[in-house]
Amino acid sequence: MSEQTQQQNSEEAVENVEAVETVETVGNADGVQEQAAAEPAYEDLQARIAELEAQLKDEQLRALANEQNLRRRHQQEIADTHKFAGQKFAVEMLPVKDYLEMALLDQSGNFDALKMGVQMTLNELQKAFDATQIKEINPKAGDKLDPNIHQAMQAVASEQEPNTVVGVMKKGYTLSDRVLRPAMVTVARKEA
């Protein structure tokens, strides 16, 4: 073979190798593109991870807020239970105070010693009431009737404005802010 033929064959061989490499490169590029299309991109995965982390954080915050609300509600219920724990006792003590006050109003005899003993008992009972936050509801004549703290027992014709207190039959009492017994009152009605 001549040098020229060898050189031509050599050039053709180089061209064939380059053509095969070009085809392989194009084939590999197509394969990479197909593989990339089949799998999500790294950025897409990062975005999904961030989305899931945000969702998890939101759920954690909601659970924490719910727990705090439950704890606060429970503490309030406990505080209310403590605040009104002596209510039954307080209701039972009200008639005792009423009877002692009636005994002090008795002007029939000379019972100074008895009266002094009753007064001392009443003072001690009042101290117990003060210690347990029991307060009197003792409306004055002319006060407007408040159905939350007063109970109208009788309506009488009066020159006072209707639905105002004329007199108190029995004092009312509260424990903290809760009414144990409303004040039993006589109220004014329009004169006929």
Swiss-Prot record:
Transmembrane segments: none annotated. One of its GO terms (biological process) is protein folding. Pfam families: GrpE. It comes from the Bacteria. Keywords: Chaperone, Cytoplasm, Stress response. The keyword Protease does not apply. Signal peptide: none annotated. The keyword Cytoplasm applies. GO terms for cellular component: cytosol. One of its GO terms (molecular function) is protein-folding chaperone binding. It is found in: Cytoplasm. Homodimer. Participates actively in the response to hyperosmotic and heat shock by preventing the aggregation of stress-denatured proteins, in association with DnaK and GrpE. It is the nucleotide exchange factor for DnaK and may function as a thermosensor. Unfolded proteins bind initially to DnaJ; upon interaction with the DnaJ-bound protein, DnaK hydrolyzes its bound ATP, resulting in the formation of a stable complex. GrpE releases ADP from DnaK; ATP binding to DnaK triggers the release of the substrate protein, thus completing the reaction cycle. Belongs to the GrpE family. This is Protein GrpE. The gene is grpE.
